[in-house]
Amino acid sequence: MTPSELRRLYSIVRVLLSYGLDELIPKMRLTFPLRVGRRLLFWLPNRHRNMPLGERLRLALQELGPVWIKFGQMMSTRRDLFPPAIADQLAMLQDKVEPFDGKLAREQIELAMEGIPLEEWFDDFDIKPLASASIAQVHTARLKSTGKEIVIKVIRPDILPVIKADMRLMKRLAGWLPRLLPDGRRLRPREVVMEYEKTLLDELNLLREAANAIQLRRNFENSPMLYVPEIYSDYCRESMLVMERIYGIPVSDVDALKANGTDMKLLAERGVQVFFTQVFRDSFFHADMHPGNIFISYDHPEDPQYIGIDCGIVGSLNKEDKRYLAENFIAFFNRDYRKVAELHVDSGWVPPDTNVADFEFAIRTVCEPIFEKPLAEISFGHVLLNLFNTARRFNMEVQPQLVLLQKTLLYIEGVGRQLYPQLDLWKTAKPFLESWLKQQVGLPAVFRALKEKAPFWAEKLPEIPELFYDGLRQHKMLKQSVDKLAYELRTQQARQGQSRYLLGIGATLLIGGTLLLISRVEADMVPTGLIAAGIVAWIIGWRRTR
């Protein structure tokens, strides 16, 4: 390790120990190197003994900086690895840091515009940031060409070296973890860190965020449910994003929403509808829908509309995943646990040799107590969590797209019940899921699929005779190759058989001739002839094996 990495490692260890996070590892599970290391750092005591462990972990990550804050946010979605007391605290991590100098932001913008002065593109640039986070910060301005109000999101100039340095250190720590902790290998730390690095580097590319926002805006064009601000692509760069400025009420400000006369029940139900529409209709969902990224339009409070921003993280499901997920939800709420177990096996989420009866019993044991609550109080997100945790015992592989989905679903549920505590999520979602499933099966679905594929087959139709002829010719050539290979194999086997026969004869002649030669006092041509014949047989047999 380099001196700078050692200094950073020491500062990380100092923060972790000052919050007593060595308690995360039970003493009986500590390996010898960790026990020795802890004793050598005796001057770093736990200074926050009165705080719960989850809160201490959250505060420590916040103190360590942006890379660790975002890592904690990502790990908050892995509720299959952490108990609720820790996962809930990780979900509260706030990605807020001190803003950097607005003059430096201006320099970054002009650098992204290849040296063109900012005034040539924008008017009324506000040097004071509107918002600031660990990766980027936002400034307001107007487009010079149209006068429209915009916001400019610019990447922090000093963030990339920090990320690279901390990621190198994380990778080293991930390599040590399997040797230091008994369960380190099961947690797959290398894969976790690699996944995190990819997510973080994706967030540094604002062109990716711009493309996501454009797609989401297209999906909900003219929709009364969701509005996505316009992206001005001509001005966007990898380190700079320019979008329409919006005005709305933060979704977490319930008092302001009520004061504006918002229909809270309809607003909560629309949040659920927006989510399921993104997942099942569009196969493209905003996967970072925490309250800081959601606003409500001031207009038409009786017909409220969501406004979504910050599309840096999105998720998608393929057609099979969507079908299995919808059928899983319906089977679960119908208490058809056999169906739930079979769906997990059929989808490939668990190994095909899984004992379905045992799996069904495990699901029933975990999920049946959930129905002691009224349906309106049952959480979709926790249903998924319970199913995934049970499936992990049956060697379910982690499905990244489903982890993102579960995290987003928990966000949506939390927001919906904050807006309208009596929200019946199942009552809102069931008609949507049943309608979607009906569209996927039966004759209408077959005709629709044929209609969708018709242009493709119409284009390929003239090529079919030629493709058929090529197929027959290739089949003939393949048959000839197989016949030739079979002939060569038979010939080789025959040669090997003859070779083994000659080698055996040669060995017999050599041994017999040698014994005769030893037993006879006088020289005799017979033993010599036998030995010579044996040598000749060996040579011929050896040549046939080549």
UniProtKB/Swiss-Prot annotation:
Annotated GO MF terms? ATP binding; protein kinase activity
What's in the GO CC field? plasma membrane
Q: Which GO terms describe its biological process?
A: regulation of ubiquinone biosynthetic process; ubiquinone biosynthetic process
Q: How does it sit in the membrane?
A: Multi-pass membrane protein
Q: Where in the cell is it found?
A: Cell inner membrane
* Residues reported to bind ATP: 130-138, 153
Keyword check for Nucleus: no
Keyword Transferase tagged: yes
Q: Where is the Protein kinase domain?
A: 124-502
Alphabetically ordered keywords of this record = ATP-binding, Cell inner membrane, Cell membrane, Kinase, Membrane, Nucleotide-binding, Transferase, Transmembrane, Transmembrane helix, Ubiquinone biosynthesis
NCBIfam families in the record, alphabetically?
A: PRK04750.1, UbiB
PANTHER family, per the entry:
CHAPERONE-ACTIVITY OF BC1 COMPLEX CABC1 -RELATED, PROTEIN ACTIVITY OF BC1 COMPLEX KINASE 7, CHLOROPLASTIC
Give the record's family classification. Belongs to the ABC1 family. UbiB subfamily.
Query: How is this protein named in the record?
Result: Probable protein kinase UbiB
